[in-house]
């Protein structure tokens, strides 16, 4: 009976460690995804600013496009 309890305790401990490691990995992947999205959004803003400066009518086009897509 004592051997069974030790085995069960060992399995429980190993399961907790495994779940903890998987959770940490999942959080790290989520943070990497957020960083990638933020960097991509920053590049898009820079491109829009560059295009708005280069082409005079571009900013009005973008404003109309986003207003119509946001409000249906």
UniProtKB/Swiss-Prot annotation:
<dbReference type="Pfam" id="PF03032">
    <property type="entry name" value="FSAP_sig_propep"/>
</dbReference>
<comment type="subunit">
    <text>Homodimer; disulfide-linked.</text>
</comment>
<keyword id="KW-0027">Amidation</keyword>
<keyword id="KW-0878">Amphibian defense peptide</keyword>
<feature type="modified residue" description="Phenylalanine amide">
    <location>
        <position position="71"/>
    </location>
</feature>
<keyword id="KW-0044">Antibiotic</keyword>
<dbReference type="InterPro" id="IPR004275">
    <property type="entry name" value="Frog_antimicrobial_propeptide"/>
</dbReference>
<keyword id="KW-0929">Antimicrobial</keyword>
<keyword id="KW-0732">Signal</keyword>
<feature type="propeptide">
    <location>
        <begin position="23"/>
        <end position="48"/>
    </location>
</feature>
<protein>
    <recommendedName>
        <fullName>Galensin</fullName>
    </recommendedName>
</protein>
<comment type="function">
    <text>Antibacterial activity against the Gram-positive bacterium M.luteus and the Gram-negative bacterium E.coli.</text>
</comment>
<keyword id="KW-0964">Secreted</keyword>
<dbReference type="GO" id="GO:0005576">
    <property type="term" value="C:extracellular region"/>
</dbReference>
<keyword id="KW-0165">Cleavage on pair of basic residues</keyword>
<keyword id="KW-1015">Disulfide bond</keyword>
<comment type="similarity">
    <text>Belongs to the frog skin active peptide (FSAP) family. Brevinin subfamily.</text>
</comment>
<dbReference type="GO" id="GO:0042742">
    <property type="term" value="P:defense response to bacterium"/>
</dbReference>
<feature type="signal peptide">
    <location>
        <begin position="1"/>
        <end position="22"/>
    </location>
</feature>
């Amino acid at each position: 009976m004592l051997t069974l309890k030790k085995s069960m305790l060992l399995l429980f401990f190993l399961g907790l460690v495994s779940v903890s490691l998987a959770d940490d990995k999942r959080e790290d992947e989520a943070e990497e995804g957020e960083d990638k999205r933020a960097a991509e959004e920053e590049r898009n803003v820079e491109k829009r600013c560059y295009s708005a400066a280069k082409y005079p009518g571009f900013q009005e086009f973008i404003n109309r496009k986003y207003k119509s897509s946001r409000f249906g």
